[in-house]
Regions:
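DUTPase catalytic domain/fold
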Residues: 1-139
């Protein structure tokens, strides 16, 4: 279910009741399994209202296209004082479908290990950035 016709994500619902204690996390069942369109994977993301109003966050979740099991969501209660109660039918997260590209990993003669795009360009040729990272290109 999408919240509106322009919503990027599909709402995921809890099938059971859970109590998420302060600072703890739980794995929540959704009761669904999905078949993804070719060339896509599923990304499980938080719902902004749960995060802002209740301090409930979704930990990273990736659904690979060949996964056939139940979609489950890892929720963490960031509120250190109050438990959060989840009831059946609560919208707990959203599923966003994203396209992906499989790149060939190629080892180079230097310490850099790069990726080759579908065009055959290496990431090193495209970036020419070197080994600097984490803020090396500025703000």
């Amino acid at each position: 279910v999408r919240g509106s016709s322009d919503a990027a994500g599909y709402d995921l619902f809890s099938t059971d009741s859970y109590v998420v204690l302060p600072g703890r996390r739980v794995v929540v069942s959704t009761g669904i399994s999905i078949q993804l369109p070719p060339g896509t994977y599923g990304s499980i993301r938080p719902r902004s209202g749960l995060a802002v109003k209740h301090g409930l966050d979704v930990l990273a979740g990736v659904i690979d296209p060949d996964y056939q099991g139940e979609v489950k969501v890892v929720l963490q209660n960031l509120d250190m004082n109050q438990p959060f109660v989840i009831r059946p039918g609560y919208r707990i997260a959203q599923l966003i479908l994203e396209n992906y590209t499989v790149a060939e990993v190629v080892e180079t003669p230097t310490e850099f290990t790069g990726l080759v795009t579908e065009r055959g360009d290496s990431a090193a040729e495209a970036a020419r950035r070197g080994a600097a990272g984490f803020g090396s290109t500025g703000l």
